Amino acid sequence: MNGRNVKAISPLFDITVRRVGIVARDYNVRFPNGYRDFSHSLPDVLTLLDEKGCDTALFSLYSIIPRQGYDLLPTLPNFANLKMIGVEEFKDGRRGRKAGDYVVYYRAPDGWEEYRFKQAFGRVNWQAQRGYLENFAQKRIPERVFGSCCILVCGETNGVKYDKIGNKNICDPCGVRAAIPPHVEVILNPVHDKMSRFEMIMKRRFLSEGGRYVISVWNKGKRDCNGRCKDGFGLPWTVFQNGAAVPVERLPNDLGVEIGILNAN
């Protein structure tokens, strides 16, 4: 498309993340524009976050359905505060959702640009994938670092391992955490839907050691095999710093989404 600024490799983008808007929704809800994504509420959500002083907007995954006549990039204004927006494109079909590119929209000197990549893995077979994970740590992690933040998409946090045979702690056998540069203060971890296994919380705590924030946000609406909702009434996000949970309350709004704001100073 003419006029687009699209980066295929490291965007040379530098941001100091200080205030993060965290946005989630029920992914079964169809909005007034007919789509089960964020596109209907996105302009108002971004305006609200900008007014609240956020420099970063992190949306739960399955974020935007790409389609003819809808293109977010050229519509982004010169916000006073927002410098980075993270969303995932996806297909919404009768048989379920299919994830596409993860897209980082970021402010460059000459306007908004976009940087695309795909989730590298979710579940891990440690016997079969050790070499793959080592390559991810060495090659892919550097491409996910944007100034003071790094992005791990959904189950990529499984790149650190729960030692179920030994001391029952989390370890880093393939160097995924070690590959994140020391200057990174925030790990952004957008998620598709709620991960209920106990070790996911342990892995987020582990990744947050050393004073980093780990921000995870997911969609509500996940159902079990009997059709019962698995989310309950809890918040659709967690935040940890240095192994401890950081509370982030809901921001009241009438936009049909759930919003929290984290001061990562």
Label the predicted regions.
Residues D14-T16, T47-G53, P77-F79, E143-F146, ...:
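Flexible, charged surface loops at secondary-structure boundaries
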Residues F31-F38, S60-G69, R94-R97, V124-A128, ...:
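Acidic-and-aromatic substrate-binding clefts and catalytic sites of carbohydrate-active enzymes
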Residues V23-R25, K118, V217:
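Conserved beta-strand termini and adjacent loop/short-helix elements that scaffold enzyme active sites
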Residues C54, L82, G100-Y102, S148-C149, ...:
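Short, surface-exposed beta-edge/turn micro-motifs
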Residues V6-N33, G147-N158, L188-P190:
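Active-site-proximal beta-strand elements of phosphoester/diester hydrolases
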Residues T16-D71:
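Short, conserved active-site loops that position catalytic residues or coordinate cofactors/metal ions
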Residues Y62-I85, F90, R97, V160-I261:
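CN hydrolase (nitrilase-like) catalytic-core segments centered on the catalytic cysteine
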Residues N2, R94-E185, L255-N265:
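Active-site catalytic loop in hydrolytic enzyme cores
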